[in-house]
Regions:
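N-terminal membrane topogenic signal
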Residues: 1-11
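Alpha-helical transmembrane segments of multi-pass integral membrane proteins
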Residues: 10-21, 102-106, 126-143, 154-181, ...
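Interfacial helix-start motif at the membrane-water boundary
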Residues: 49-74
Length: 207
């Protein structure tokens, strides 16, 4: 695999920081009882008031802690498994590594932009930056010209394309409906405590 020199230190750094960030999100001490407030747009929201995500809403905190759990139980083991195999030349591991880095990039880009400011903000930014450049290096190491010859003729290309297209269509319908509803009904957008739709922007722009 190309760019091994950089990836050999970048990926362990990502794993260490992601393990710390995810564990902190799940086990950070302190907090009180959730409380209600009204946002600047007149929307009633419930603030979590516990742990690392104390300043986020109950709904947002639950979603972020679910991401933390996925990171600890799935993403980090996959990085640990795929990295040495990819370095030894396994194409499957290389593609798995790229996909897992994409997950880390998406997760910590959204955390850096959407999570209420907390003690780990700099960690989120570091993970966003490291995973972005690691993903770029990982993708640059793929022999794109020789890639078709590495796949079986029996690969279900249409099924894969349908799955990807269906996922994109589902997200588009779901998020565009949420975006246009306030225009049509004259109601406040469902932003909770935020000022804009960060996840919707990422999903519609990237996914």
């Amino acid at each position: 695999m190309k760019h091994q020199t950089h990836l050999r230190w970048m990926i362990p750094a990502i794993m260490l920081l992601a393990a710390f960030a995810a564990a902190a999100g799940l086990f950070w001490p302190g907090g009180g009882e959730p409380y209600a407030l009204v946002s600047d747009r007149g929307e009633a929201v419930l603030i979590h008031a516990r742990g690392l995500y104390a300043w986020d809403t109950v709904s947002s905190a639950a979603q972020m802690q679910a991401n933390d759990l996925v990171t600890l139980l799935l993403a980090l083991p996959l990085l640990g498994l795929a990295t040495p195999l990819a370095i030894r030349g396994s194409l499957r591991a290389h593609l798995l590594l790229a996909g897992t880095l994409g997950y880390v990039l998406y997760t910590y880009l959204s955390m850096a932009m959407l999570t209420a400011f907390n003690q780990l903000f700099v960690v989120y930014v570091a993970l966003f930056s490291l995973s972005l450049f690691a993903l770029v290096l990982c993708l640059l190491g793929i022999d794109v010209a020789g890639l078709p010859a590495r796949f079986s003729a029996g690969l279900p290309r249409r099924a894969i394309a349908a799955l990807l297209g269906g996922t994109g269509l589902f997200l588009s319908v779901a998020w565009l409906g949420r975006i246009t509803a306030p225009w049509l009904n004259g109601t406040p957008p469902a932003l909770e405590h935020t000022t804009t739709m960060v996840i919707q922007a990422l999903d519609l722009g990237l996914v």
